[in-house]
Structure formats: C-alpha cells, structure tokens
A protein has these predicted regions:
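Basic nucleic-acid-binding interfaces
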Residues: 1-150
Length: 150
C-alpha cells in the first residue's frame, strides 16, 4: 500500500486538513515561551490520539496553522474541540496573566477555518471518468470470457 494512505481496521484513508484558529480578540499572545509551550502542547495532544498526526505546524503571533491527518473516526469539529479545550485549560492555568486578558476562561475565538488537502478537482474528475471507462472494458472482457466458456 502506498505511503499516501493510512489504515484503520476496516478502511484506508487519506484525510488531510489545513486548520487555522485564533485566540479570542486575535491578541498577539504567541511569542517567546508561550509560543514554544503551545507548540509542545499541540504536539503532545495530537500524539495522544490514535489516528491524528501533524504534518506541519506553524504558530504566528496571533493564530495557529496546523496541517494534519485526521482519521475518519474523528470529525474535524471533535478534533478542534479537543485541541482548543485542552490548550485553553493548560495555558490559562500555567500563564495566569492570560486570565486577565481572557476573562471567563475563554482563550480561543469561537470558530476556525478548515480546508481539505488532496488531489485537485481536475485529477479527481479524470479519475472518475477513467474508472467508468475501465469498468466497461472489464465488463466487455468478462462477457467475452463468459461467451467462450459456453
């Protein structure tokens, strides 16, 4: 099997996503130790869940870019809830000064951006067309084989 795909017990998949999320009010809080700590925590949290894998991680001063594999057993919203929830609890308890900026213990903005990564639309459409042609060729060959055996 190609390295391009991942495997679960009953499926193979290639589910890669580009996720972007920001702290509430888009404050530039990811600098110095907080940035390094956040990067370590994201890597640790992702490694704790089977079926999640970081491809790229880039933390800017006011947002996080994350490219990752997400197994089909998880929804993107589950993964984002897990990440944002755990990161908020850990960072607010470690960095008390953030609690003053983010009252109510709400560290993250409500939303996030997600886009899928994979084969472009043109290649997918070509593949689908090719599959139909190949299926017809297979059916014709099977028909010839069936006719010869009678």
């Amino acid at each position: 099997m190609s390295k391009r795909f991942r495997r679960l017990s009953h499926s193979i998949y290639e589910c890669k996503y580009h996720l972007v999320f920001c702290p509430k009010y888009r404050y530039p809080i990811f600098e110095g130790e907080i940035k390094a700590y956040t990067e370590r925590e994201i890597e640790k949290l992702i490694s704790q869940k089977e079926g999640l894998e970081i491809i790229e991680l880039n933390i800017q001063s006011d947002h996080v870019h994350l490219v990752m594999w997400i197994a089909p057993k998880y929804s993107v919203s589950q993964v984002m809830g897990y990440l944002k929830g755990k990161l908020a609890l850990r960072r607010l308890s470690r960095y008390e000064r953030l609690g003053k900026q983010y009252w109510g213990r709400h560290l993250w903005g409500r939303g996030y951006c997600v886009s899928t990564i994979g084969i472009d639309e043109t290649r997918i459409r070509e593949y689908v067309r090719w599959q139909e042609k190949k299926q017809k060729e297979i059916e014709q060959l099977q028909g010839k084989l069936f006719d010869e055996t009678e």
